[in-house]
Amino acid sequence: MAAGERSWCLCKLLRFFYSLFFPGLIVCGTLCVCLVIVLWGIRLLLQRKKKLVSTSKNGKNQMVIAFFHPYCNAGGGGERVLWCALRALQKKYPEAVYVVYTGDVNVNGQQILEGAFRRFNIRLIHPVQFVFLRKRYLVEDSLYPHFTLLGQSLGSIFLGWEALMQCVPDVYIDSMGYAFTLPLFKYIGGCQVGSYVHYPTISTDMLSVVKNQNIGFNNAAFITRNPFLSKVKLIYYYLFAFIYGLVGSCSDVVMVNSSWTLNHILSLWKVGNCTNIVYPPCDVQTFLDIPLHEKKMTPGHLLVSVGQFRPEKNHPLQIRAFAKLLNKKMVESPPSLKLVLIGGCRNKDDELRVNQLRRLSEDLGVQEYVEFKINIPFDELKNYLSEATIGLHTMWNEHFGIGVVECMAAGTIILAHNSGGPKLDIVVPHEGDITGFLAESEEDYAETIAHILSMSAEKRLQIRKSARASVSRFSDQEFEVTFLSSVEKLFK
């Protein structure tokens, strides 16, 4: 009897859920239709707003070209791409209106342009309008101690919405890697959309790190020690990679900065028909003006690192390798070496990172041999590179490495990480001659630095000449040609 009652209750429960199926389907369908109508209405309003923005004082329609670059005042390689891209477009389309969406609310537009000239020696030929975004904190990694990739990506949608509400462009280019803004501007804003990818938000290498339970800056030790958490994170990464591929595929034009980035974007976005390698612009000519003499303006040897103070740049590896080298030199003879770390700080997190690096050099007892130069002018950067014997780079899987190219053009012997863009595109033989060195571990770096310093001046000069000859393919002029060719589709 009890079994019969349970069976009857189960049937009754199933009938109840079945009775809700069709009403639920109707409700869901109605909500979807309402959502589509609302979004379509917003799109129509934005199209009307776009016409008002693009109409000039003389009544003619002007094309509005916008770049999404929330950290345009940061002073890194990505910002150099932004200013060179703007300059190239202004030369070809002088009648267009140019807009930059930025979150640098602590400065004005003129200060941003002056900073671009001071750091990169770039001056635009036509005015640029800056749209200042108040919600940039939504893409700060410090806001998301867990699920950082997802948090920042969702935050970028809200930041993109703020940008779209203030200015609706005809052509939208994401120049900083916020792929989740692409469908927003394409389907809601009705824009032609393009993207310049410096570094994929997620890569197959990151998946491998989690899968193999290796410790990394994106994989905490407590996760690697727990098989269950590793599995959960791996599922999260695979789901995120799938969504990242969907939003990225919305782009009409995709530009990537290296062979390494190309391989990852092709596997994730699957838009090979509209994807091209556009090497980032490096001001090689300015550095090529530095005479190729053996650096004897200062006693001893100067080692220089150029790169923003971000965690993935792995500056601690440079300091530890340098300390290991100094310890060996102190045994042999008094050291005459100095390490100068040059880079930009975007925010308080970067400033805190610099302070941690200072403490690390103190803990290792090498503080008097290590200097930090933050947000320095371009002329000062050039002066340091002209004096340096070795240029250091330690980022694992660096997407490209503008700092690496600048060091080579300036005549330093480059010692870069044996991965990513430096390995595949930059520190490669030129006409059969070596152009620099690659390393991975702390010991590798220390030993290779010692090897470079032990070389004769003539041998170093030969490597420096080969390196200089190889970097012409990364010039501003080459960038302009390939960039304009790639984005041409957006203007048809």
Swiss-Prot record:
It is found in: Endoplasmic reticulum membrane. The chain crosses the membrane at residues 20-40. GO terms for cellular component: endoplasmic reticulum membrane; membrane. SUPFAM superfamilies: UDP-Glycosyltransferase/glycogen phosphorylase (SSF53756). Keywords: Congenital disorder of glycosylation, Disease variant, Endoplasmic reticulum, Glycosyltransferase, Membrane, Transferase, Transmembrane, Transmembrane helix. Residues 234-254, 400-420 dip into the membrane without crossing it. Its main location: endoplasmic reticulum. GO terms for molecular function: alpha-1,2-mannosyltransferase activity; GDP-Man:Man3GlcNAc2-PP-Dol alpha-1,2-mannosyltransferase activity. It is a single-pass membrane protein. Residues 41-233, 255-399, 421-492 are cytoplasmic. It catalyses: an alpha-D-Man-(1->3)-[alpha-D-Man-(1->6)]-beta-D-Man-(1->4)-beta-D-GlcNAc-(1->4)-alpha-D-GlcNAc-diphospho-di-trans,poly-cis-dolichol + 2 GDP-alpha-D-mannose = an alpha-D-Man-(1->2)-alpha-D-Man-(1->2)-alpha-D-Man-(1->3)-[alpha-D-Man-(1->6)]-beta-D-Man-(1->4)-beta-D-GlcNAc-(1->4)-alpha-D-GlcNAc-diphospho-di-trans,poly-cis-dolichol + 2 GDP + 2 H(+). It comes from the Eukaryota. GDP-Man:Man(3)GlcNAc(2)-PP-Dol alpha-1,2-mannosyltransferase that operates in the biosynthetic pathway of dolichol-linked oligosaccharides, the glycan precursors employed in protein asparagine (N)-glycosylation. The assembly of dolichol-linked oligosaccharides begins on the cytosolic side of the endoplasmic reticulum membrane and finishes in its lumen. The sequential addition of sugars to dolichol pyrophosphate produces dolichol-linked oligosaccharides containing fourteen sugars, including two GlcNAcs, nine mannoses and three glucoses. Belongs to the glycosyltransferase group 1 family. Glycosyltransferase 4 subfamily. This is GDP-Man:Man(3)GlcNAc(2)-PP-Dol alpha-1,2-mannosyltransferase. It comes from Homo sapiens (Human). The gene is ALG11.
